[in-house]
Amino acid sequence: VFLRVTNKSLPMGGRRKTEYKKVQPARAPKGDSIEDRPKEIEKREEPFHWEMDSVLSAKEGGSKKRFLTMTERTSRADLMFLMPDGTMASVVAVLDMLEKKLGSFNFRRIFQTITVDNGSEFQDWEGMTRTVEGEGERTHIYYCHPYSAYERGSNENGNRMIRRRVPKGTDFAGITEEDT
């Protein structure tokens, strides 16, 4: 019945996992390493621990817009926000907006920790952790090892699903917040 079906016909196209050498980062992020993250988070035993990444628009001549994606580790619930660019200020602005909508208490309860990669958009550790209301931290940020996307596997799979709808090279200029 499936005489002409091959691995290339599948969504992952028969790709194999390759092993990479660990590369030392040019600069160490100020936040905590993923190695310091409690084991309960690693085992996905507790809810409300998130992974965060950004999805780029077209590189050549496209708009600077990006998607900021957040994936909850236990339920795999996804949140997606359209940012005007890939700056640290845009990431902090999305977190500020979320905290204002939810309230400081609810934000702290829902977003207990956020694990990010070492991208330039996530280097403002102070901005991402400081609360807009009152004092103290709104969340705790953990940084993955460089070139180790598998440490945020749920988020990377969610980004792969986005790329099925919006392939690489697509310009996000015509996309609005309502479209997300």
Task: Give each language-model segment a name.
Residues 116-118, 123-126, 132, 141-164, ...:
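RNase H-like two-metal-ion nuclease catalytic core shared by retroviral integrases
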Residues 1-5:
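Major-groove recognition helix of helix-turn-helix-like DNA-binding domains
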Residues 63, 80-105:
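Active-site beta-loop-alpha junctions of metal-dependent nucleic acid enzymes
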Residues 72-73:
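Short, acidic, Ser/Thr-enriched surface-loop or helix-capping motifs
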Residues 76-81, 168:
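Short small-residue beta-strand/loop micro-motif enriched in glycine and branched aliphatics
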Residues 53, 76, 95, 114-117, ...:
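Mobile genetic element proteins and their domesticated derivatives, centered on retroelements
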Residues 6-67:
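Mobile-element integrase/transposase regions
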Residues 105-110, 136-138:
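Short helix-terminating capping/connector loops at secondary-structure junctions
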